[in-house]
Amino acid sequence: MARYRCCRSQSRSRCRRRRRRCRRRRRRCCRRRRRVCCRRYTVRCRRRR
């Protein structure tokens, strides 16, 4: 079950349905919640704890 965490600019439901948008901001980490839109890059963002 892939859960896509989106940044404040994107909503959860939108990110889940539109994965193409995630690829665009795949390098963008949410500084507030330290989470990335795409789950692949969540590990990278989580490392910055």
Swiss-Prot record:
Protamines substitute for histones in the chromatin of sperm during the haploid phase of spermatogenesis. They compact sperm DNA into a highly condensed, stable and inactive complex. Belongs to the protamine P1 family. GO terms for molecular function: DNA binding. The keyword Nucleus applies. GO terms for cellular component: nucleosome; nucleus. The keyword NAD does not apply. PROSITE patterns: PROTAMINE_P1 (PS00048). It comes from the Eukaryota. Its main location: nucleus. This is Sperm protamine P1. It is found in: Nucleus; Chromosome. Testis. Keywords: Chromosome, Developmental protein, Differentiation, DNA condensation, DNA-binding, Nucleosome core, Nucleus, Spermatogenesis. One of its GO terms (biological process) is sperm DNA condensation.
